[in-house]
């Protein structure tokens, strides 16, 4: 009992450190601060928790329920404790991210444990490196570095990063059974939780749910050919894999829902070869931004794993086959969807993750395989962890901020409170209408503080208890605020 408690105690410390590091990262180093019109809209607008035909985002059940619920928790639970509204939103969002990322790392740890039976120490080294790869994957000398847990603003954290994390958690959980060739014989409670998570994963984002679909589709292809090899019938295959076939069917249904939504209608562009070509160029440019250090370590690790697998005549080729299958499906899907929507999407780390994560997983699992086959090689684990911790801290201009236009979070904080003070002053004076001064934005609609955001920010402040009534707000761009806060006017 003593050794087992120490074993669990070490794991608790390890994952506790991951959780704490993410909380610190997203509250102090790179705070998740609301800033633009989308943030103020999505903090309070709560949708039905089912896909809705004809809605602007028909299938975004996960982000469009979690974000406003987090906003309510921030306003009515965290805000009274910390005494700062914007900090409450930042802390709540950081806790959500820390919880999901910690779960993601734990499920990866359990997958490695189940597949390779590594020592606790070796598994922690592999998991720590897997965690660091999400930060060290890209490198830029002269501009802020993107990372796989980052995005363009707080809304996109909830709408892209979190859906990707939920999909990855489901994939890692399913993979722990598939690798062991075990059936999903779960208790009713666990089965219901799994189905709920699959529901949220599929009905989250059409650029993120490909993670689950690519994995399940690849598993089905492998099982199908194995079934044919055993001279099995089609009916038996369908019956034996009804669960995974059902996941693909629901995913396809979700795509149909999404294709008839308001956002798809607004895009209104047809697929074209030029669009696919432009998307492909941006896709290749993203690959070109991958850190040389990560690429070298990845190539050496994968090569060592392949060499060992070849010598031992084991089934390591199945992992490569799964990697190629998931990567190919994800790449083709993203190229086509982004070419239809906007080629620039694929140049975002929160979208590119749906493709590149398979390579990151292959690198980490290959390292685990090498540690399993060559026990003494574990000594390089701490060296690699230290190396990438240092690399993460050496980025040319640090990590990209999760704010629109990469405005420093401290400046966003000051502007937010300027807006809050203006609106609360009008509320104290009993006004039902007001003019809200905001920084001057772009020429189209004054983004990131668009002229149409007045009703949205008023509704959010009213729902969160900052004002006593809804106020009709007219947005007035003011260049003086740009000078005051040293922000450039967007072009």
Walk through the language-model features, giving the residues of each.
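Intrinsically disordered, polar/acidic, low-complexity terminal segments
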Residues: 2-65, 79-126, 376-491
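Membrane-interface junctions at the ends of membrane-embedded or membrane-associated helices
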Residues: 2-6, 114, 175-190, 221-238, ...
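Membrane-interface alpha helices of multi-pass inner-membrane proteins
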Residues: 189-217
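Transmembrane alpha-helical segments
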Residues: 100-112, 166-178, 213-222, 299-306, ...
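Signature aromatic-anchored transmembrane alpha helix within multi-pass, membrane-resident enzymes
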Residues: 188-191, 244-248, 316-321, 369-397
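Transmembrane catalytic cores of multi-pass membrane glycosyltransferases
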Residues: 27-91, 95, 206-350
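Alpha-helical transmembrane segments
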Residues: 9-26, 126-133, 193-198, 242-251, ...
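Membrane-interface micro-motifs in multi-pass membrane enzymes
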Residues: 122-176, 333-366
């Amino acid at each position: 009992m003593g050794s087992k408690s120490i074993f669990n105690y070490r794991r608790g410390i390890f994952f506790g450190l991951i959780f704490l590091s993410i909380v610190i990262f997203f509250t102090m180093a790179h705070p998740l601060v609301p800033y633009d019109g989308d943030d103020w809209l999505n903090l309070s607008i709560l949708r039905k928790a089912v896909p809705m035909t004809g809605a602007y985002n028909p299938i975004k059940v996960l982000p469009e329920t979690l974000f406003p619920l987090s906003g309510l928790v921030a306003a009515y639970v965290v805000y009274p404790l910390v005494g700062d509204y914007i900090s409450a939103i930042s802390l709540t969002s950081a806790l959500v991210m820390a919880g999901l990322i910690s779960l993601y790392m734990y499920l990866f740890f359990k997958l490695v444990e189940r597949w390779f039976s590594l020592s606790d120490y070796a598994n922690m080294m592999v998991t720590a490196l897997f965690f660091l790869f999400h930060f060290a994957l890209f490198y830029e000398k002269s501009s802020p570095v993107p990372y796989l847990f980052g995005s363009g603003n707080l809304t996109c954290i909830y709408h892209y990063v979190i859906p990707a994390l939920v999909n990855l958690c489901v994939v890692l959980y399913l993979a722990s059974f598939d690798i062991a060739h075990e059936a999903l014989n779960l208790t009713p409670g666990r089965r219901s939780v799994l189905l709920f998570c699959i529901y949220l994963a599929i009905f989250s984002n059409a650029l993120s749910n490909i993670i689950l679909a690519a994995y399940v589709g690849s598993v089905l292809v492998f099982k199908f050919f194995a079934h044919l090899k055993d001279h099995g019938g089609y009916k038996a295959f369908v019956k034996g894999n009804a669960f995974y076939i059902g996941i693909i069917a629901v995913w396809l249904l979700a795509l149909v829902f999404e294709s008839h939504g308001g956002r798809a209608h607004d895009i209104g562009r047809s697929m074209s070869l030029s669009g696919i070509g432009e998307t492909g160029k941006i896709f290749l440019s993203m690959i070109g931004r991958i850190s040389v250090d990560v690429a070298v370590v990845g190539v050496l690790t994968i090569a060592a794993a392949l060499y060992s697998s070849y010598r031992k005549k084991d089934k390591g080729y199945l992992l490569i086959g799964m990697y190629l299958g998931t990567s190919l499906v994800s790449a083709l899907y993203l190229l086509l969807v982004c070419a239809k929507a906007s080629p620039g999407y694929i140049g975002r780390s929160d979208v590119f993750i749906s493709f590149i994560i398979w390579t990151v997983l292959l690198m980490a699992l290959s390292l685990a395989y090498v540690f399993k086959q060559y026990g003494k090689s574990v000594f390089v684990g701490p060296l690699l962890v230290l190396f990438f911790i240092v690399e993460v801290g050496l980025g040319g201009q640090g990590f990209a901020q999760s704010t629109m236009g990469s405005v420093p979070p401290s400046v966003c904080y000051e502007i937010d409170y300027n807006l809050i003070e203006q609106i609360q002053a009008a509320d104290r004076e009993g006004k039902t209408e007001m003019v809200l001064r905001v920084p001057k934005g772009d020429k189209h609609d004054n983004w990131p503080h668009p002229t149409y955001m007045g009703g949205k920010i008023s509704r959010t402040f009213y729902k969160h208890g900052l004002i006593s009534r809804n106020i009709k707000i007219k947005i007035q761009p003011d260049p003086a605020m740009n000078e005051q806060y040293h922000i450039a006017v967007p072009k």
